[in-house]
Curated annotation (Swiss-Prot):
Chief subcellular location: Golgi
Signal peptide region: none
Highest rank taxon of the organism: Eukaryota
GO CC aspect terms: cytoplasm; Golgi apparatus; plasma membrane
Protein name in the entry: ADP-ribosylation factor
Keyword GTP-binding in record: yes
Lipidated residue numbers (N-myristoyl glycine): G2
One annotated GO biological process: vesicle-mediated transport
InterPro entries named among the record's database cross-references: Arf1-5-like, P-loop_NTPase, Small_GTP-bd, Small_GTPase_ARF, Small_GTPase_ARF/SAR
Localization, UniProt: Golgi apparatus
Keyword field: ER-Golgi transport, Golgi apparatus, GTP-binding, Lipoprotein, Myristate, Nucleotide-binding, Protein transport, Transport
Keyword check for GTP-binding: yes
Family: Belongs to the small GTPase superfamily. Arf family.
Length: 179
């Protein structure tokens, strides 16, 4: 009952909600991004074995962001978070040239899942502050993003530690809500 009333007020006040699944390979910066958005500061992180979930407010949208660990042994568990996901944030370590193909394979596998067929995709090309980082155009090519035809997608260059690009990514997601 309480949830129904809060949703009614949210709709009357123009407040919207979006369920986001944030995934990517281990050490890509997912947890750092989540807490930079939530708290506005850098937090010391350890590898995420399960998940972190936080609500991030941006403009009139309440994003519920599920940050799920990216270690290879726990990636099969990602599927348990797919239900009701409206947006996917796939975080890529722009400096990790050795694993960009692995990142592409994981993303393509996810995008083939029926439960995610209606989810929009935001790729965050993270760690742009590092000197050897691939730019967004190079990551777009290496991740095969131009071949995605069945959903809206966007790539944003980011630096989780400074916050550069994070709100531009949220801006794109916020424009997708209700489309």
């Amino acid at each position: 009952m309480g949830l129904t009333i809060s949703k009614l007020f949210a709709s009357l006040l123009g407040r919207r909600e979006m369920r986001i699944l944030m995934v990517g390979l281990d050490a890509a910066g997912k947890t750092t991004i989540l807490y930079k958005l939530k708290l506005g500061e850098i937090v010391t992180t350890i590898p995420t074995i399960g998940f972190n979930v936080e609500t991030v407010e941006y403009k009139n949208i309440s994003f519920t962001v599920w940050d799920v660990g990216g270690q290879d042994k726990i990636r099969p568990l990602w599927r348990y978070y797919f239900q009701n996901t409206q947006g996917i944030i796939f975080v890529v370590d722009s400096n990790d040239r050795d694993r960009i193909n692995e990142a592409r394979e994981e993303l393509q596998s996810m995008l083939n899942e029926d439960e995610l067929k209606d989810a929009v995709l935001l790729v965050l090309a993270n760690k742009q502050d590092l000197p050897n980082a691939m730019n967004a155009a190079e990551i777009t090519e290496k991740m095969g993003l131009h071949s995605i035809r069945n959903r809206p997608w966007f790539i944003q260059a980011t630096c989780a530690t400074t916050g550069d690009g994070l709100y531009e990514g949220l801006e794109w997601l916020s424009n997708q809500v209700g489309k």
